[in-house]
């Protein structure tokens, strides 16, 4: 009997371990894909909460605020880089992949974070920067000093300056080159980012092996997944034209297989700002690549829609990349730790977004984006609510940025992307409750409409009408609507400019969401199944007439309706 059961058990195990390539969303296997219905909260340890008065946030401070995150409704935290680093690029210049920056704490503190988060049902993801190291990393220092070093070919070198030495820069307007001369090595090294961030050469099998050791190490520490930084550059073949690079697409499924082998539930979230026709190179045709990716393409047209009220390009941007493997998922966001990248828009479209949301040069960055927080950029509570209601109702997983739940502002006096990386504002006390230090490592916003005395967690917790309490409610609502993350979806035709109506179906549930991008109230009509719908926000009923759903929606208004099923 045992011998007869063994092949069956092995077959079942293999079925659950492999990606599903053709299966409807009704399948029970999708219930195990936790990343399809989680709420992700992105933060930097250094700007979140200081526990010891050093002026810099730390792991113990984060542990102290886990109950706050639980109350907010967060079940996944994505940590920005916290490994040892010279911090010339806010930690994205790693000098030791296997450690904790002592500014933030110790390995013991990290273990306690894993334990306390797990107790509360919170998963911890981490940023992993495998594309490049710091130029202070021992690998690079040894590589530059000794051409016969085993680490020399961890990087890409050229004795002569390549003809495309000043092309393919990640930060145009700030960078001057992508090949920089190193005097000690008497050679040029390749770097897509700043010159102190030399790119690793993933065509070298030793680099791939080392990257797996790094991933395995952190999986052993208890993390539930990785936000994989700069994926298109990781798979780039050195020496190819950086404007039209060649890619080794086998690297992505190789990383996926290793991560799945070490932890079958671990997630890989890819940062790949690519065109829709390239998506399956990263997801994999059968779902063997990245589990999830940020939808940068839709994000750019979303901001165009918010700026102009013209949502036709946004609708197209939602539809174009929808054909992805069933086990894959899009991650939607409004703001992240970088600039709002508008590089895919036409120059005319980009100028319209600039005029509305970033008219001053100090608000713009890298000739392609805006370096502002959402609240001061939109400048309108109704529009802010509509934008977040939209985020939580888009067909994927929502990712929010720390502080956006209270409408934090930005500090444009800070360099480049640091404008949106200011300390969290917990109260109206000293340094916004972030730190008891006389001086914080980065200034807390203390002047203007978004000063910590006016915008902080404590004040909003006491105010039932606050943005914080509104956000708690919309997150709770999103968790009650699994059809958004798992169901089939379509965009319904209304004939009303500026109004987006989406329908979701999962099993016997139908959800309809309505969002008005317009500055004026509008009446909307569309075809809908069933006869009665319950308004999940206002808690009243709406009836269709002859299959037509008619509703009036105010400027920047939004509604969520669930079809009532009567048997």
Task: Please identify what each model-predicted range represents.
Residues 1-24:
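Bacterial Sec-dependent N-terminal signal peptides
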Residues 22-567:
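Active-site and adjacent substrate-binding regions of carbohydrate-active enzymes
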């Amino acid at each position: 009997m045992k011998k007869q059961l063994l092949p069956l058990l092995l077959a079942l195990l293999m079925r659950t371990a492999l990606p599903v390539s053709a299966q409807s969303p009704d399948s029970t296997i999708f219930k195990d894909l936790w990343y399809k219905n989680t709420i992700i909260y992105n933060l930097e340890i250094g700007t979140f909460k200081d526990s010891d008065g050093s002026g810099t946030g730390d792991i113990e401070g984060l542990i102290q605020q886990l109950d706050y995150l639980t109350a907010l409704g967060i079940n996944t935290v994505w940590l920005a880089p916290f490994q040892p680093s010279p911090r010339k690029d806010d930690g994205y210049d790693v000098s030791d992949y296997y450690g904790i920056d002592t500014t933030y704490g110790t390995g013991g503190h990290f273990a306690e974070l894993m334990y306390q988060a797990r107790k509360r049902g919170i998963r911890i993801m981490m940023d992993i920067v495998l594309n490049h190291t710091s130029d202070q990393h021992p690998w690079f220092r040894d590589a530059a000093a000794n051409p016969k070093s085993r680490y020399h070919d961890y990087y890409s070198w050229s004795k002569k300056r390549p003809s495309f030495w000043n092309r393919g820069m990640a930060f145009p307007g700030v960078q001057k080159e992508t090949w920089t001369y190193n005097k000690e090595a008497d050679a040029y090294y390749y770097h897509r980012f700043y010159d102190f961030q030399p790119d690793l050469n993933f065509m070298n099998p030793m680099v791939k092996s080392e990257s797996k050791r790094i991933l395995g190490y952190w999986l052993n520490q208890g993390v539930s997944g990785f936000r994989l930084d700069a994926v298109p550059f990781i798979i780039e073949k050195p020496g190819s034209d950086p404007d039209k690079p060649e890619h080794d697409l086998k690297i992505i499924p190789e990383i996926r297989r290793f991560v799945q082998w070490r932890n079958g539930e671990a997630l890989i979230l890819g940062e790949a700002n690519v065109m829709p026709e390239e998506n399956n190179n990263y997801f994999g045709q059968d779902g063997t690549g990245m589990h999830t990716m940020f939808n940068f393409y839709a994000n750019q047209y979303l901001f165009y829609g918010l700026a102009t009220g013209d949502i036709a390009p946004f609708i197209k941007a939602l539809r174009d990349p929808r054909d992805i493997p069933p086990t894959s998922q899009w991650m939607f966001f409004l703001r992240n730790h970088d600039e709002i990248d508008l590089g895919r828009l036409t120059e005319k479209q980009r100028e319209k977004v600039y005029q509305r949301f970033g008219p001053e040069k100090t608000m713009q960055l890298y000739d392609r984006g805006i370096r502002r927080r959402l609240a001061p950029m939109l400048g309108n509570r109704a529009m802010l609510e509509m934008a977040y209601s939209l985020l939580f109702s888009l067909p994927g997983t929502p990712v929010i940025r720390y502080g956006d739940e209270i409408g934090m502002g930005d500090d444009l006096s800070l360099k480049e992307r640091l404008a949106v990386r200011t300390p969290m504002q917990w109260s109206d006390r000293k340094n916004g409750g972030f730190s008891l230090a006389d001086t914080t490592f980065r200034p807390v916003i203390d002047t203007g409409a978004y000063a910590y005395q006016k915008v902080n967690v404590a004040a909003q917790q006491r105010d039932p009408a606050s943005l914080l309490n509104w956000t708690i409610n919309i997150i709770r609502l999103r968790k009650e609507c699994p059809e958004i993350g798992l169901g089939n979806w379509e965009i319904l035709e209304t004939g009303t400019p500026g109004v987006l109506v989406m329908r979701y179906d999962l099993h016997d549930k139908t959800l309809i969401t309505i969002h008005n991008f317009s500055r004026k109230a509008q009446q909307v009509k569309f075809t809908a199944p069933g006869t009665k719908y319950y308004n999940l926000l206002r808690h009243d009923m709406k009836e269709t007439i002859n299959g037509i759903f008619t509703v009036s929606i105010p400027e920047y208004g939004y509604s969520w309706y669930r079809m009532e099923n009567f048997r």
